[in-house]
Amino acid sequence: MLKDESTSKSENPFLIWYFDGETMFEDIVEASENFDDKYCIGVGGTAKVYKVEIPGAQVFAVKKLRSTVEGIETENIKSFTNEVAALTKIRHRNIVKLFGFCFQEEHSFLVYEFMERGSLADMLCSEEGAKELDWATRVQVVKGVAYALSYMHCDCVPPIIHRDISSKNILLSSDLEAYVSDFGIAKILKPNSSNWTTIAGTYGYLAPELTYTMAVTEKCDIYSFGVLVLEVLMGKHPGELITNLHYSTSTSIPLKDVLDDRLSPPTSQKIVDELALMQSLSLSCLSAAPQSRPTMRSVCRQLEMQAANN
């Protein structure tokens, strides 16, 4: 029922339940008072997320599948198994950790590490949160997501495509480090397969080619990453700007025109240079032609070279 036997009990107190799924189940149900809404911290299309604190252990985020009187819907089961399949294959500091899962008719849920600051989307929507996300922090958020995607695309065999990179699926820790979450529609690319699928993801982040082809590739994530980077720079979704880019022959946009005006302009030349590079990378990731978009490995390499040169 639980995974990650390699982690020591001192590092992960949740592991004490590895061999006793019934105890784990009972403790979570008890701590959440049978998943009372007062512990709910988020609602998605297929699940609710609860903040659950187990006595003597740490705080966890528990994602509970929605169910009906007929049981769990087929689509929800698919999302559940997708998430388990993806997260049991990967380990990266910028990808949220799955500690365990339970699949039962009454309650089916996944147990993750809890991210104290919630989603990047919520932080950017809040005046106070946006100001707390200063320019240096935003640079680190972008790098964290880039490293996670590069790992998934280039270091996992076979590669894993997230398919729903958006600000609501980037979670922030207490020190505002970025973690990629929600692998419910992730796809593991199978060799010698067409990897065709139905369109899925968050409107406003979907690669344009998905309107005429069902083939999922790394380039779909890269387009979504481009949208996300502009959103981090601007402090809001860059919908109108992207539309203008697709219909314009020029991709030259002054940096000052895309920076969140809730923050004071950056004064450090190092930060200015990093923000300018991120703007440039985001525009290349948003190319209408998938083959023209860079790989995530290339994106990370350029970010690292910029940091080294400063």
What positions do the PLM features span?
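Conserved alphaC helix of the protein kinase catalytic domain
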Residues: 39, 85-88
